[in-house]
Amino acid sequence: MNDKWYRHIIGARTIKTGLATFFTSLFCMLLNLTPIFAILTAIVTIEPTAKASLKKGYKRLPATVIGALFAVVFTYVFGDQSPLSYALSATFTILICTKLNLQVGTTVAVLTSVAMIPSIHEAYVFNFFSRLLTALIGLVTAGLVNFIILPPKYYHQLEEQLALSEKKMYRLFYERCNELLLGKFSSEKTSKELSKLNIIAQKVETLMSYQRDELHYHKNEDNWKLLNRLTNRAYNNRLFISHLSNIIYLPKHTSIAFDANEKIALINISNSINGIIQKGSFARQKKSIATLKSSVKQMDEFDQNQMKSTLIYEILLIYKILDSRYAK
């Protein structure tokens, strides 16, 4: 827990941004350079992972060079008191950065371009190379800070999001089964809940991608094992959500009639799944599963019961996912 205390007060990325700003301004002042442009570069260079910082840094540096170059050129042509110098510098910087696929550096490049115009005066060459140097200082300093200090660890966030996802998807399955038993085959409420669930699942995918990138720079066998375990857990959740979506998004005018035994089976299974979070375990419902399997076997998949057999099959697959997850 010692490495997590700061999360309750201030985020690691915020700390690293502050440190990158401090060291960048310090180096610039030691070299008698204006630090503001380097600081702008350093602030936006702090990314969720070291890999992202390096990858985007490769594009931000040439973008900054382009912005500085246009600032010098248009100031030379129109002077630093002309609105055209600012407008054309910003416009051409955006245009060229877009053409060269340097969009990640466009914002800093434009800010650098328009901010340096008032201070250029007639020292065109000096200002161009000084801005180039300060941008390089900002990129390198921020990259090193992001790589060395408080390397990003997303395990805690992953655990939280996975737990939240599981809580919501078990509850949503329970609610959907109740709707089906009541003959409510189209539901805006469960559709919205499913959309929220998919957003959480996408966030999990993003966090796993960040952590995977980070482990390529900070290799650790135990951390790889932990990430693999979380990845498998997320994969199973995705399968669950996929099958859950198939019992939520049903064709229009769907109508399914369950007999008494099937209704009891659905109630038992949905209650068991809904109780996983509270109980911390999965209570098997073998008799109920046998009932649903028997129902499917008695149906012809090409008769009027085709949708019913498909729906029961999806429920059986969801049960199988959980049965495998909680196998002893």
From Swiss-Prot:
Transmembrane helix in keyword set? yes
Is-annotated flag, keyword Membrane?
Answer: yes
Question: Where is the protein found, in the record's own terms?
Answer: Cell membrane
Record keywords, A-Z? Cell membrane, Membrane, Transmembrane, Transmembrane helix
Q: Enumerate the transmembrane spans.
A: 26-46, 61-81, 109-129, 132-152
Write down the membrane topology: Multi-pass membrane protein
Q: Name one GO cellular component term.
A: plasma membrane
Among InterPro entries, the record links this protein to: ArAE_1
The record's listing under Pfam families reads: ArAE_1
Q: Which family does it belong to?
A: Belongs to the UPF0421 family.
Listed PANTHER family:
MULTIDRUG RESISTANCE PROTEIN MDTO, P-HYDROXYBENZOIC ACID EFFLUX PUMP SUBUNIT-RELATED
* This protein's name: UPF0421 protein SE_1574
